[in-house]
Amino acid sequence: MMQPKKTKFRKAHKGRIHGVASSGATLSFGQFGLKAMAPERITARQIEAARRALTRHMKRVGRVWIRVFPDVPVSKKPAEVRMGSGKGSPELWVVRVKPGRILFEIDGVNDQIAREALTLAAAKLPIKTRFVARIAE
């Protein structure tokens, strides 16, 4: 699972996701990618599940780039604990994704396999996504 080695603060505010992605909105490494179409918090487990689906369908041919990293801790109180007495302990790590952000990029496979693999990966994510391809130059 992906998580930061060290952070400045243990706990983070909930926050809101406003606007569209300005950085990370274009393909940088691969020929094909998966673009987010809605704002959402994506967990490290969901990213890992999508990565596994991607690499298994590609049969470990080609290259995969994960363009997002879960760096925001989400705290949670234990079950059946009364309200108050402070914020809960960090439970999981998420990334706040804005619409237009590229989540995954792949290269070294043909168009059909790339489309199938990214569709499988998209099914593991709690967000509406779109398949994008680099325009032939």
UniProtKB/Swiss-Prot annotation:
One of its GO terms (biological process) is translation. GO terms for cellular component: cytosolic large ribosomal subunit. Keywords: Ribonucleoprotein, Ribosomal protein, RNA-binding, rRNA-binding, tRNA-binding. GO terms for molecular function: rRNA binding; structural constituent of ribosome; tRNA binding. Gene3D superfamilies: Ribosomal protein L10e/L16. PROSITE patterns: RIBOSOMAL_L16_1, RIBOSOMAL_L16_2. CDD domains: Ribosomal_L16_L10e. The keyword Ribosomal protein applies. Belongs to the universal ribosomal protein uL16 family. Part of the 50S ribosomal subunit. Binds 23S rRNA and is also seen to make contacts with the A and possibly P site tRNAs. This is Large ribosomal subunit protein uL16. The gene is rplP.
